[in-house]
């Protein structure tokens, strides 16, 4: 049974953390995490409309591997990136700015592939509200 009053979707617009699967050759043991919004978030919906306009303007389809298609993809997923942890450049912490996010996603396709898969998975953003004695189903 699904009780609609027990569904917590606040993470859709507040974000949820992806722990990035770092290739073994690059993994130093410190986790890399990216906080992302869902495809159901207000920001994604707005950015997706712009993404579709860009693709239509250039007569491209979703997943197009042309330069314009890849840039549109990077901008779309940069929009839903809120923060990150464990990302360094030259040994120093690298701030999570839109410019840096775009640079990371454009140069490291293994990262954007994980971001893309994460934001479309509802389970990453939907949880059950804690049950109180009044809301617990009877045994």
Which sequence ranges carry the predicted segments?
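Short, surface-exposed, charged amphipathic helix/loop patches that serve as local interaction elements
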Residues: 28-139
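Generic marker of residues within folded, mature protein domains
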Residues: 10, 24-26, 71
């Amino acid at each position: 049974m699904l009780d609609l009053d027990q569904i917590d979707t606040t993470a859709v617009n507040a974000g949820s953390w992806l722990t990035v699967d770092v290739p073994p050759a690059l993994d130093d043991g410190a986790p890399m995490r990216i906080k992302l919004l869902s495809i159901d978030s207000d920001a994604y919906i707005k950015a997706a409309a712009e993404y579709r306009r860009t693709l239509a303007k250039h007569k491209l389809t979703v997943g197009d591997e042309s330069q314009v298609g890849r840039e549109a993809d990077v901008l779309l997923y940069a929009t839903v990136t809120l923060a990150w942890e464990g990302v360094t450049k030259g040994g120093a912490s690298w701030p999570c700015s839109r410019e840096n996010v775009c640079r990371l996603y454009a140069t490291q396709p293994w990262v954007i592939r994980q971001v893309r898969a994460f934001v479309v998975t509802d389970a990453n953003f939907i949880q059950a509200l804690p049950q109180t004695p009044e809301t617990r189903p009877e045994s």
